Amino acid sequence: MAKESSFDIVSKVDLAEVTNAINIAMKEIKTRYDFKGSKSDISLEKDELVLISDDEFKLEQLKDVLIGKLIKRGVATKNIQYGKIEPASGGTVRQRAKLVQGIDKDNAKKINTIIKSTGLKVKSQVQDDQIRVSGKSKDDLQKVIAAIREADLPIDVQFVNYR
C-alpha cells in the first residue's frame, strides 16, 4: 500500500441553491401579512446578496426568512458575510451580504495548524483557494476530517476528491 491517498478541503456555496432559496423566500415574503405593501426584495448579484426593505426591523425579518430557506436548501450560512445597513432610494434600507467562495490565507493557516496539531503522518498544501491533504493511511485522513469538523472555523468547509 505504497500509494498515497488524498482529499481536498474546499469552501464553496452552491449558487443554484442560493437562487432557489431566494425565490422561495420572495414567494413567502409576498404572501406574508406583515410584509403587505412593503418594498422588500432579495437579489443575487454575482457573488453578493442584496437585501432591501422599508426599515431595519423588516430587513432583519427578511434576513431571518432568507436564512431559514438557505438552511432548508442545505446552504451553509457561515459563508455569508453581512455588510452595514445603509439607506437606499425611496426611503428604504439596503444591506449587502458577500458569499464567501474559497479558503483565504488566514483560514488556510488555521486549518493547517489544526492538521499539524493532530500529530498524524499527513501532508497538507495550500493550492489557491483549497487545501490538499495527503497521507499513506486512509484512517489518518479520516481522523483529520473529524478534527477539522470539530474545529470552530469561521467558514463552512467541504471535503472533496477523496482518493
From Swiss-Prot:
UniProt keyword rRNA-binding, yes or no: no
> What's in the keyword line of the UniProt record?
Nucleotide-binding
Q: Which GO terms describe its cellular component?
A: cytosol
Q: A GO molecular-function term, please?
A: nucleotide binding
InterPro entries registered for this protein in UniProt: DUF520, UPF0234-like_C, UPF0234_N, YajQ-like_sf
Asked if Membrane is a keyword of the record, the answer is no
Its function, per the record, reads: Nucleotide-binding protein.
User: What family does the entry list?
Assistant: Belongs to the YajQ family.
UniProt xrefs under PANTHER family: UPF0234 PROTEIN YAJQ (PTHR30476:SF0)
Protein name per UniProt: Nucleotide-binding protein GTNG_0630
* Source species: Geobacillus thermodenitrificans (strain NG80-2)
